[in-house]
Amino acid sequence: MNAYVASVIDYVKTTHANQPEFVQTVEEVLSSVSPIMDAHPEYEKVDLLKRMVEPERMFTFRVCWMDDKGEYHTNRGWRCQFNGAIGPYKGGLRFQKNVYEGIIKFLGFEQTFKNSLTGLPMGGAKGGSDFDPAGKSDAEVMRFCQSFMTALYRYIGPDIDVPAGDMGVGGREIGYLYGQYRRLKGVWENGVLTGKGMSYGGSLIRPEATGYGAVYYLQEVLKHENDTIEGKRLAISGYGNVGWGIMKKAAELGAKVTYFAGPDGYIHDPDGVVGEKLDFILEMRAKDPMHCKPYADKYGVEFVPGEKCWGVKDVDVYMPAATQNDVRMESAEKIAASGVKYYIEVANMPTTNDALNYLRAQKHMIVAPSKAVNAGGVGVSGLEMSQNSERLVWTAEEVDAQLHKMMKNIHKVSAEAAEEYGLGYDLVAGANIAGFKKVAQAMYEQGVF
């Protein structure tokens, strides 16, 4: 490893020791970029890596709100504007009780390179709160969102920082956030947020975009291996917007999700989640997002409580699509032993570093990284920004075609970057290198500040 790269990784481990998720993603990305640093000693002269691992700015604020009983609560909010070298800051908002500064920074750092891979002019950012919308009334969520935006609005804008949804932040929350932004600013700037409803400037297929893009990326991997998606059986974790998008697009292209996992266990449906079953997934999730067992009850298929589907052998592709560090070493060993060839990360950093390195070392496996695979979500957010700027609404077919083109290009540039540096078909390193190169050169050309 390049000595400068190693020193920056050590620096992050020392100065951010209480933020393990952030340390993990920095180590995962920087461990791939030694060839670039060897080829560009000028980057070390301006201390580019140490600047890159520190956010440009980080806002922390209190969010006070009143529940339906008239009792007051205070949560913490964050917005991390990590890197704006290639465009306005762009990244989602996560409302989840386990959110803290380290998770926001990890997501913002990862977002920087993901956005770079899309080819669109978007910098990296992330934000959120330790507020949990689950179990809250619509009125309580509205009051929280209004308070959150009151603290945030002065730091964002269509050409400054454009938040979007993430875990715990869907169309309802985006609507409340935009309503408060408009109330405070007194202007119509619907490009300030993405993931909006169609009635006020949203984009078609945005909720499904991450899942659709993941399947398009898988399709490119299969093409590279002279294989086809037709008939492929997929095992996924999660059945939210991302998981549902995977199910729907896989079915359209002739594949099927035969295993999917939720918080309470996993489902095995040999016939796949297709047809009207896709509609039932939406109904089930809306009623109770914590339990997938009702699917087994309705369709008479197998439900395994309290377990994940990692290690099942009668599938062709694994796609972790739930949350970070879902797949640890024990699960990775089961996955490798199953003989399955394709491991396609979809959630942000769903695999621990030791598990990821273990899977990458398996000669029979191809591993694709989340920052490339799930970039379709933010890619379509970027397309929503374009539509807002043009005062136009594109058809679903137009958006889907642009998404498909984008995912093909992300796979192409990742594979080419790996090949350029003698790494074969290493998509993990290739995505890190391809995303890093653009950001690094932009930072270098803009000087030290």
Language-model features: where?
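Rossmann-like adenosine-cofactor binding region
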Residues: 265-367, 372
